[in-house]
Amino acid sequence: MGLDFYRRAIELQDKYRKPGMTFENTLQTNGTLLDDEWCEFFKENNFLIGISIDGPRELHDAYRVNKGGEGTFDNVMRGLRLLQKHGVEYNVLTTVNRINADYPLEVYRFHRDEVGTDWMQFIPIVERVDDQGLSLYQEGTEVSERSVQPEQFGRFLTTIFDEWVLNDVGSVFVQTFEAAASNWMGKPSSGLCVFNETCGGALALEHNGDLYSCDHFVEPNYNLGNIADTDMIELVATDQQQKFGQDKLDTLPQQCLDCEVRFACHGECPKNRFTTTADGDPGLNYLCAGYYNFFTHIDHPMKIITSLMQAGRPAAEVMPILAREAADLEAAVAKVGRNHLCPCGSGLKTKKCHGPKRTVEAPLPRRLPVHQAQPRARVVAVSEER
């Protein structure tokens, strides 16, 4: 559309702005075509720019390639540095796939230390495909090879959370963690639709005026109409759209309704609810196992953060509290044998819990050839046994 399109959009905002009305403009981009002119425009008009980058070069270039099959990392970083040069506000969006999900700390620390961002989003890649590996609408139970695996995604989030909660609370903000904190505090909205009880507020407007229920459901069955024919406010209020949002709650399987972390998850995004429970009920989220592990893992620190904030104290005070707890546990572990019960109270032997472990750092992968075949993975029912 070009820069002139956005200049015209700003002109129309100014023309029709009513007293007391404010506009917030955001734009998501991979940054590869940014130049000084674009960045000057963004700065002048207070745009918030989301940059799509999937971690260090080896991880980013695994899937983010240009038409020639070449990695785009250098061009993305060039665009990012231009935003920084012009003082444009930006944040980072990372798609979590089956490759970079195995390197959570490398991704997080790269964004924090090399990119220099203090706000991150981690979006799981879950793509449904047919027998030929072609992308489908909301059908079937097979996913593409690059789709992150459920427990793999849970480990990704958990590992980053442990780094963040001990070192970066108050200085780095991770969207999933912020939403979780809101739900632990019992707020009416987490600020993130996938973790709210109902949804329907994140509609998608196409260039031709067609309005869809959600940007994950830009499909014929979810076309609400065209804003050239009907006012947008009327389309948003239609029974079709209200039902779409309410279905997020009404279609939860019994396993979700009985789940101890339902308040934090709410079944996540409806687009990912295509597996079945152990009892055969449809509508279980493909990522259920990972989210369950993540939300149960963060329960203790989230309760501390909640109590701090409700007392009017900064959430960052959780860091020294957890550091003291860790030191006390380490001292207790040192006093027991490997085969004794772990002092943490898990009921496991120390060697299987908080005992010393050998760690081996895995090297970052080389970029996959773009012509490499992409085998499929079939989703099976997720058992209630956690």
Question: What are the residue ranges of the model-derived segments?
Answer:
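Short cysteine/histidine-rich metal-coordination sites, predominantly Zn2+-binding motifs
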Residues: N272-C288, K303-Q310, K357-Q372
